[in-house]
Amino acid sequence: MRISASTVLLGAASAASAASFQNQAQQVLADNFHKAHDAIKPVADSFAHTTLESFEEAFNGMNSQAKALWDEIKLLVPESAFDKPTWFSKPKAAKRRKDWDHVVKGADVQKLWVKGADGEKHREVGGQLDNFNLRVKSVDPSKLGVDKVKQYSGYLDDEANDKHLFYWFFESRNDPKNDPVVLWLNGGPGCSSLTGLFLELGPSSIDKKLKVINNEYAWNNNASVIFLDQPVNVGYSYSGNAVSNTVAAGKDVYALLTLFFHQFPEYAKQDFHIAGESYAGHYIPVFASEILSHKDRNINLKSVLIGNGLTDPLTQYEHYRPMACGEGGYPAVLSESECRSMDNALPRCQSLIRNCYESGSVWSCVPAAIYCNNQFIGPYQRTGQNVYDIRGKCEDDNNLCYSALGWISDYLNQKDVMDALGVEVESYDSCNFDINRNFLFQGDWMQPFHRLVPGILKEIPVLIYAGDADFICNWLGNKAWSEALEWPGKKGFNKAELEDLSLPEADKEYGKVKSSGNFTFMQIYQAGHMVPMDQPENSLDFLNRWLGGEWFEQ
């Protein structure tokens, strides 16, 4: 998860660098009036057209703690902040291209009917696709040298809402006619999945000189992989509007996959899996549920994988203190007094999150995010330690602690790269922090999307994996929520013992795994927030074994 420093001020947990946090003198909520003003203004804007009666009804429906926190925020913001509604997610400048190899019209796909086994006719695929089109460009592998395999790039267009999602597909290096297909999603919310491509698990990385370096442990060694920039205005994606919650983004992803597999039926017959990390812990349960809700579909969804995700905040936030205070396998980052302060803040934080879970209201969920993130993430950030890797300091405050993110952005901003991919925006950014704030202030951050997981487990396997050196979405919290999840297999899963996880040809283990009834948890040693970056060989090993069904319920 990632955010801008101003958003950290009001608690979004996808932290920017601690160095930037300190340099801009950002302490807790009340320490920076102007940043608070900028960050809270979108809340006012979102209610600009709300009637007074509904406004009062929503406010009066909050519990006392949520009201108290809104009162604290109100003291920081002058009345002028509520005067004019302005949309804070600025649209990207873009110019439509005409040179596409294929255009798939959702309206045409919507018209297709087939006869079922019962002899009755029904639509070939479900869902509302009329407004969607898919544009496809065949990428010449020799132009960029990222990989030698067959590649496609392009946009999913929602013409009615002016939304355009960019994707980049790489065929499997091994046996594309039979290997599975994986959709990869980075988190944020608001971070490009092309960072996952070049920083973690794609066929190549980018060095300091912007040269393409082959990755021998790429996830497309034995699977075809789609990297998707979503929601809109992330990476190469763009829109004049904005998506501000996970559920809305799920409709777009379903449409993209449906039209892609319609255009390329040779991949539609393969097993399909969704994988992602960080805020994808929100995305993936929603996206998988959206796909599974359509009985008639051409998406052969077989499993989902969530790495170092944020999925159940109520359970996970309890484990920031132990991770920061020396109980997660690494030395303590915080002092004893700071750890005690976290202990003291936990009851209020949990009460606020529970109220968000119960009401689902922006008025309850935004205060929960603001308070909890300032109490549990702010103290860690102020130490200068890397929130994505507890083993070291944040080394590059301009690029979320990792200089390579800057190299990737520079590479993807080159005109020849953009032309080769059919890109329509004028510039690329690894993360769009406006979107991050947008999701935060629409109450998406603290939503209980883990409640969708039991329904998913009824149909497909779920893997939760976590690098054990990550702080921001740490392994303690991920293990805890997977064990706290209420589902029919809970007792069996919790009784299952953690077993050694190691490469078949190696004696040294690289993690632990427990599995029962379609649910699997993995702890990956010596890996931070981005497991494939820190443990490339080991992550490819567990991916291949997972896709091969090693831990699937038979």
UniProtKB/Swiss-Prot annotation:
Q: What is this protein called?
A: Carboxypeptidase Y homolog A
What span is annotated as the signal peptide, if there is one?
A: 1-17
Q: Which domain of life is it from?
A: Eukaryota
Function noted in UniProt: Vacuolar carboxypeptidase involved in degradation of small peptides. Digests preferentially peptides containing an aliphatic or hydrophobic residue in P1' position, as well as methionine, leucine or phenylalanine in P1 position of ester substrate.
List the GO terms this entry assigns under cellular component, sorted alphabetically: fungal-type vacuole
Q: Which reaction does it catalyse?
A: Release of a C-terminal amino acid with broad specificity
Give the originating organism. Answer: Sordaria macrospora (strain ATCC MYA-333 / DSM 997 / K(L3346) / K-hell)
Query: Where found, per UniProt?
Result: Vacuole
Q: What is the lineage of its organism?
A: Eukaryota, Fungi, Dikarya, Ascomycota, Pezizomycotina
Which keywords does the record carry? Carboxypeptidase, Disulfide bond, Glycoprotein, Hydrolase, Protease, Signal, Vacuole, Zymogen
Residue ranges annotated as propeptide in the record:
18-137
Q: Which Pfam families match?
A: Carbpep_Y_N, Peptidase_S10
Q: Where does the sequence pass through the membrane?
A: none
Q: Which family does it belong to?
A: Belongs to the peptidase S10 family.
> Which molecular function GO terms apply here?
serine-type carboxypeptidase activity
